[in-house]
Amino acid sequence: VKELRKQPGIYRQVLKSKLEVGISPLNLNSTRLTASLLAETNGQVVSHSSLRNLLDKHRFAESSDPRDKVYAFLGLANKSLSPFRTQPNALIPDYNLSVQEVYTETATVLMSSYKNLSWLSHVEDASQRQISNLPSWVPDLSVSLQPYPLRYRGPAHWAAAGSRHWRPAVTNMRKGLLRVQGIQLDHIDQTSLLIDESEDPSAGWASIVNLALSLDSPYPDPGATGKTPSRVEVLWRTLTTDIYNHTYPSPSETGLLFIDYILNLQIRHRLTPWSSADEFQPHHSPLSDFIYPNWRKLFELEPPDSQYKLSSYTKRLTTVVESMFNGTYSPIGLAQLQHELDQSGGRQRRLFKTRRGFMGTGARSLRVGDEVWVLYRGGLPFVLRPLPNGHYRLVGESFVYGVMHGEALKMGLLREDIVLE
């Protein structure tokens, strides 16, 4: 956009407008320019992207024929990279195939070529799917992907199953059945509300605080790291997937930013009546006791040496309020934290707790009774929903604090072979 403003040409009026174009046109224009350079140089100078990268990049694009969300990029993909490096005749356009068949074959080709399950992270929430009868493990490429896969959050290099291998059963995959290996980490027994699921914005935070209050102390340590994170620390590290400003794990200072964030929420909520269009009534509280987040109790339960204990919290509250009144306080430093919370949870991912006391964040559609699995070559844990026939449906990827780097493999849990459909 900066370069375009220097020489706007025919785009001058567009740049003056308040039109919001989003990322899709920019990505399409980038790919168009790359294709033009390839044509000019006979493909000798400009390196072009893998098919997988193109599918990622243009997930937000629209197409009158959903099959073209795959077929349109076959001619632009680098044939020396996967999947064509090992399957040169893969994905030949055939409009006699249904959308379901094209998307299932695409998932089969990509996963069997890369020999990992990371493509599962591209499955959108069930509430967003539009193509019917797709296997649960096959992304619906006809719709935009929101939120984006967690692996794009930062340099975490998660490997929940360590270096365990997975061998694709291609014949079964083409039939819509994905055979995988892994360990069942736990069952989900408590979930939070999302921000848009209640008319009162405090209800979501109240459910999140209740999740944190239900955690055991000490928090599970399957990796025998010797770490004893408090409830508040587990909470903010889970809410941000332990990433702050592309740093993993998040620096401890992020926890203090989180405290400031909570203070700002509480102050804003308590002042709501003052900004109401109705006449202010001193006896009126905008929040009922039932849904008001019980932060005080959470801070009271912090260990004596915790930087989040109640005395530290109240001291910081006094400092923030005083600086607000004298005009020296600025919440601008919370902008990055808000971004991390939005990307990791907030309106798009649901916080959960498991029976063994793990806390995690996952797909919007997850619910109590779903199971958390560490699948070989999956990178992250996944939430699965058991079916009456013994198979499973994929709900989505997840972040589970404390088991993102192979720690679950030390828990003595049984390795199982299961089928996703």
Regions found by a protein language model. Name each.
Residues 1-421:
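Acidic/Ser/Thr/Pro-rich low-complexity tail/linker regions in eukaryotic proteins
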